[in-house]
Curated annotation (Swiss-Prot):
Residues 99-162 are annotated as: Repeat 2. Residues 562-752 are annotated as: NBD2. Belongs to the ClpA/ClpB family. Required, in concert with Hsp40 and Hsp70 and small Hsps, for the dissociation, resolubilization and refolding of aggregates of damaged proteins after heat or other environmental stresses. Extracts proteins from aggregates by unfolding and threading them in an ATP-dependent process through the axial channel of the protein hexamer, after which they can be refolded by components of the Hsp70/Hsp40 chaperone system. Residues 2-162 form the Clp R domain. This is Heat shock protein hsp98. Residues 454-473, 908-927 are annotated as: Disordered. It comes from Neurospora crassa (strain ATCC 24698 / 74-OR23-1A / CBS 708.71 / DSM 1257 / FGSC 987). ATP 2 binds at G635, P636, S637, G638, T639, G640, K641, T642. One of its GO terms (molecular function) is unfolded protein binding. Pfam families: AAA (PF00004), AAA_2 (PF07724), AAA_lid_9 (PF17871), Clp_N (PF02861), ClpB_D2-small (PF10431). SUPFAM superfamilies: Double Clp-N motif (SSF81923), P-loop containing nucleoside triphosphate hydrolases (SSF52540).
Length: 927
């Protein structure tokens, strides 16, 4: 029967509560008395946030009816409970609770009432009217001094008035129930001190107040980049309303933030979302006090709740009220989303007045951070130094360019404070290691106590002594740690108390309780401030004493000060850019950088020097912050141009592959530029981003290697102009990518033909050759491209002596390769063999690459065969010597198969015969 009836949400809940009550009392039938109890004392609604429920929420409708009919609700409640207890219960409880005929009668009467009153749904008042005519309920009403059911009907009529039940939530008992459910009261939050102080933004707040004071179209929309403080402007307005710092027309208004997610969530049926939205708007328009509705991310309303089958969306429901000025609405959205969603709907857009929220400058950000400092200090229980605030604002502006101030700077402060707090609340390393040691000794003592032999007894005595020593060492450390922790905790609690007192003083002055406000302002607050100063002084004195006696006590164990170093650490962790202060070990490493790089790149002193100087400038902070160091490495093939870049990557990042490499031979066509910076709008792959721009966005501190740069199309190289000059590059979507912290390295073979000229004996480039190479570069590259390069380095040709040094490096590489592949074979190369390899691998035109081929042919091929054959086994030494003028790898074990030997000999002869013919022409660049 109930399946044909349509109930409001509250009536449906009352029926469910009545059924739950019958099950609780183990009654076999559902009776009207169950429904009466459920309506008189409804259970709390779990769908609503009980904490945010309005203070002094009204009593149930049934109670209001009893009171209006001049009855006693308590007597009525007692009579109902008495009747409920008298009902027979079953043990064990019944599996199914059925409806009694009297309950069916009540529902039928409620249904008839609904039809008579032309309501769409059966509401709570229909159920109460039907119950009042039921004999058992009539008896209870008589006990509550209500002799006739008509008194109940009249009371309901007086409360309900002429309202129609045309929606599922039309019979709400609480005033503004929809507002309580779907909005957050920002003025109440400001009153309770739950909103952070708003510093600055006066101009934007004044403009919002001016727009709200208009007669029509009084709806501002705050537009700005993410993180500039759009919501903060509204929070500032809420604080001004609470402090009565607004014009009279806004003096007693409420600022409510609409929760669009809660509004849409759970709206299963068609029309349910619209019903909720209409309920919210109706309550706003019927409210006695002025309500300003704040919708964060207002673009969510465009299409929110639309079913796709002609259903209304939220924006269309708002339009009529916005145009007439009945609804004061503040929106907030980003520039991109405003353009994408709101500008498309001109009718919706014209109802809002734009307020552009600009990004604050670094100095304004510092002021904002100083204002927020106390909140973060109280929350984390740390002290934030002013130097940390200045560092956070400056570093956020310089290194976190993809994000906006003040949001990025606030995040830095917050995370640095959290890091200090976590470090403080974790056990110091020294205590942790001693406790682990003590646990191990206790386990050892427990195990040895069962043993009977003399050695175990002696070991047991020793273990007990060790445990006592560790405990003695640990006791003072624990005491010291607890004392330091206690001091920090006491200070945090004192600060929290001060915050609470200030809040109470503000509340008292707002409420006009001047005596209490004066008492707090001139007695309690100064007293608490004095306590904090005393605690700070005691803590500073204790820390100073510990640091003075650092040799004996080891200094203070915990720190609770956030300084610039902590901020630097967070920036370095986020971006990978080394902005932390140079440690002594790192200083040493940078000072001896040439020595380290020269071990890998042989014979290129000038190139190594120029790269080292650029890195030192960058790390010491003396380089131009807007211009990344850029190099053009020229020289013959195989002289170490790319190798130097790999060595630099290994030096900086401990990984030779930690660089962004572009092989410019892949960028020979003009259109391949879109691969580097991303396809322009309208082209396929517009959203995917470019290889260069995306890599730089992810790793701002990296080495960019443009290999064989002269092979690329001229249009591709022009993109690098602004990258080398201003450290910025714009991708296909118009976003500026920061490239100020990278190192640009380009390699080129231009002018290599001039480098084959006979030079000085040490392989150095003479001035004439240098000029010829520079002319070749000038003839090929644009003047503005060459003019932006920090340093053009011409690599020297490798001499025989340098090739001989490279032999040592290559053999060390082979040894490492064997270890990486779990081959425990040690290679020993005689000095004579090394000289021979150096002589065979020397090629003025091809640099060090022929040496690799010689090593492969003369050593590696033969070594591979011997290892596979078992002539050289794991743990043995492979000796490379010169025999009869040839390089030979000596086997450690005699060969097993003669046929294989003959075959190998034939192969070696064949290799020797072919080798002279396959030798490369070393005079490739000769005219």
């Amino acid at each position: 029967m109930t399946s044909k009836m349509e109930f409001t949400d509250r009536a449906k809940k009352a029926l469910e509560d009545a059924m739950a009550l019958a099950e609780q009392y183990a009654h076999s039938q559902l009776l009207p008395v169950h429904l009466a109890v459920a309506l008189l004392d409804p259970l709390p609604d779990p769908s609503k946030d009980q904490q945010n429920a309005p203070a002094g929420a009204t009593s149930s409708l049934f109670r209001q009816v009893i009171e209006r009919a001049h009855g006693d609700p308590q007597l009525f409640d007692r009579a109902l409970k008495k009747a409920l207890v008298r009902l027979p219960s079953q043990d064990p409880p019944p599996d199914h609770v059925s409806m009694a005929p009297s309950f069916h009668t009540v529902l039928r009467k409620a249904n008839e009432l609904q039809k008579t009153q032309k309501d769409t749904y059966i509401a709570v008042d229909h159920l109460i009217t039907a119950l009042a005519e039921e004999p058992s309920i009539m008896n209870a009403l008589k006990e509550a001094n209500i002799p006739k059911p008509k008194l109940v009907t009249d009371a309901i009529q007086a409360i309900r008035g002429t309202k129609r039940v045309d929606s599922r939530n039309a019979d709400t008992e609480e005033e503004h129930e929809n507002l309580a459910k779907f909005t957050i009261d920002m003025t109440a939050m400001a009153r309770e001190g739950k909103i952070d102080p708003v510093i600055g933004r006066e101009e934007e707040i004044r403009r919002v107040i001016r727009i709200l004071s208009r007669r029509t179209k009084n709806n501002p929309v705050l537009i700005g980049e993410p993180g500039v403080g759009k919501t903060t402007v509204v929070e500032g307005l809420a604080q001004r309303i609470v402090n009565a710092d607004v014009p009279d027309n806004l003096a007693n208004c409420k600022l409510l933030s609409l929760d669009v997610g809660a509004l849409v969530a759970g709206s299963k049926y068609r029309g349910e979302f619209e019903e909720r939205m209409k309920g919210v708007l109706k309550e706003i328009s019927e409210s006695k006090e002025m309500i300003i509705l704040f919708i964060d991310e207002i673009h969510l309303l465009m299409g929110a709740g639309a079913s796709g089958e002609g259903g209304m969306d939220a924006a269309n429901l708002l339009k009529p009220m916005l145009a007439r000025g009945q609804l004061h609405c503040i929106g907030a959205t980003t520039l991109a989303e405003y353009r994408k969603y709101i500008e498309k709907d001109a009718a919706f857009e014209r109802r809002f007045q734009q307020v552009i929220v600009k990004e604050p400058s670094v100095s304004e950000t510092i002021s904002i951070l100083r204002g927020l400092k106390e909140k973060y200090e109280v929350h984390h229980g740390v002290t934030i130094s002013d130097a940390a605030i200045v560092a956070a604002a400056n570093l956020a502006a310089r290194y976190l360019t993809s994000r906006r101030l003040p949001d990025s700077a606030i995040d830095l402060i917050d995370e640095a404070a959290a890091a200090v707090r976590v470090a403080r609340e974790s056990q110091p390393e020294i205590i942790d290691s001693l406790e682990r040691k003590l646990r191990q000794l206790k386990i050892e003592i427990h195990a040895l106590s069962r043993e009977k032999d003399e050695a175990s007894k002696a070991r047991l005595e020793q273990a007990k002594k060790d445990a006592e020593n560790v405990e003695e060492e640990l006791r003072p450390l624990r005491e010291k740690y607890e004392q330091e922790k206690q001091r920090a905790k006491a200070l945090q609690e004192a600060r929290m108390k001060l915050e609470s007192l200030r809040q109470k003083a503000e509340e008292a002055s707002r409420m006009g309780d001047h005596s209490r406000a004066a008492d707090l302002q001139y007695y309690a607050i100064p007293e608490q401030e004095a306590v904090i100063k005393r605690l700070e002084k005691e803590k500073a004195a204790a820390d100073a004493a510990l640091n003075a006696a650092a040799a004996e006590t080891g200094g203070a164990m915990i720190t609770d000060v956030v300084g610039p170093d902590q901020i630097n650490e967070i920036v370095a962790r986020w971006t990978g850019i080394p902005v932390t202060r140079l440690k002594t070990s790192e200083k040493e490493k940078l000072l001896h950088m040439e020595k380290h790089l020269s071990k890998i790149v042989v014979g290129q002193k000038e190139a190594v020097q120029s790269v080292s100087n650029a890195i030192r400038l960058q790390r010491s902070g003396l380089s131009n912050p807007n211009q990344p160091p850029s190099f053009l490495f020229c020289g013959p093939s195989g002289t170490g141009k790319t190798l130097l870049t790999k060595a630099l990557a290994e030096f900086l990042f401990d990984d030779p592959k930690a660089m962004i490499r572009f092989d410019m031979s892949e960028y020979q066509e003009r259109h391949s530029l879109s691969r580097m910076i991303g396809a322009p709008p309208g082209y396929v792959g517009h959203d995917s981003g470019g290889q260069l721009t995306e890599a730089l966005r992810r790793k701002p501190f990296s080495i960019l290697l443009f290999d064989e740069v002269e092979k690329a199309a001229k249009e591709v190289l022009t993109v690098l102009l602004q990258l080398m000059d201003d450290g910025r590059i714009t991708d296909g979507q118009g976003r500026v990518v920061d490239a100020r912290n990278c190192i640009v390295v380009m390699t080129s073979n231009l002018g290599a033909e001039y480098l084959s000229r006979p030079n000085a004996k040490d392989g150095k480039i003479d001035p004439t050759t240098r000029e010829l190479v520079m002319n070749a570069l000038r003839n090929y590259f644009l003047p503005e491209f060459l003019n932006r390069i920090s340093s053009i380095v011409i690599f020297n040709r490798l001499t025989r002596r340098e090739i001989r040094k490279i032999v040592e490096l290559r053999i060390a590489e082979i040894q490492k390769r064997l270890q990486d592949n779990d081959r425990n074979v040690k290679i020993e190369v005689s000095e004579e063999a090394k000289d021979k390899l150096g002589a065979l691998g020397y090629s003025p035109a091809y640099g060090a690459r022929p040496l690799q081929r010689v090593l492969e042919k003369e050593v590696l091929n033969r070594l591979a065969v011997l290892i596979l054959r078992g002539s050289i086994r794991d743990g043995e030494v492979a000796r490379v010597v010169v025999q009869d003028g040839k390089i030979t790898v000596l086997p450690n074990h005699p060969e097993v198969n003669d046929e294989d030997d003959e075959m190998m000999l034939d192969e070696e002869d064949a290799v020797d015969e072919v080798a002279p013919e396959s030798e490369m022409d070393e005079d490739l660049y000769d005219d």
